[in-house]
Amino acid sequence: MFEGPVQDLIDELGKLPGIGPKSAQRIAFHLLSVEPPDIDRLTAVLARVRDGVRFCAVCGNVSDDERCRICSDPRRDASVVCVVEEPKDVQAVERTREFRGRYHVLGGALDPLSGVGPDQLRIRELLSRIGERVDDVDITEVIIATDPNTEGEATATYLVRMLRDIPGLTVTRIASGLPMGGDLEFADELTLGRALAGRRAMV
């Protein structure tokens, strides 16, 4: 254990996902070794993220405006919506360059053991979005692209149950080929692109 601010920094860094005690200590001592202007730039960026980044009012993706750049782009097909768990998954799908529709970010996946049920996700917003015809466009297809793990599959099954009786709506699931238990963000562009192109109807 270190004393004072150094230990406080290590403790805070250790709260970040994927950062264990040793990594937190290594990062902390790296930060202690850099020049003060570099620390100032880092803290300024963190402050801008805290104060300026919000979630898109339409899809839930991260944005610096009320609408994200994808929802604001008239070239995107508003009739096709790809449902993902987190904003990082939007970036994973975008890297494939295979999808030209829009997104809906749930903010997680169903996980009853962790207290995450339907009310903790943006499922109600998805249903409202389908019913309200955002930008005067009917949503005709919802692509479910939750992670291929237990929570992601449970979320996909729940969404199918909620969406299958909506007239004129096709519900599809990205094809198999992604490793079971993996995350979309770690899939390579070719594999994820093929999974999107080979999506299958669920209803």
Swiss-Prot record:
Keywords: DNA damage, DNA recombination, DNA repair, Metal-binding, Zinc, Zinc-finger
Family membership: Belongs to the RecR family.
Name by which UniProt lists this protein: Recombination protein RecR
Superkingdom of the source species: Bacteria
Protein's GO biological process: DNA recombination; DNA repair
Species in which this protein is naturally found: Mycolicibacterium paratuberculosis (strain ATCC BAA-968 / K-10)
GO molecular function: DNA binding; zinc ion binding
Pfam families for this protein: RecR_C (PF21175), RecR_HhH (PF21176), RecR_ZnF (PF02132), Toprim_4 (PF13662)
SUPFAM superfamilies linked to this entry: Recombination protein RecR
Zinc finger (C4-type): 56-71
Function: May play a role in DNA repair. It seems to be involved in an RecBC-independent recombinational process of DNA repair. It may act with RecF and RecO.
Domain Toprim, residue spans: 79-179
HAMAP family attached to this UniProt entry: RecR
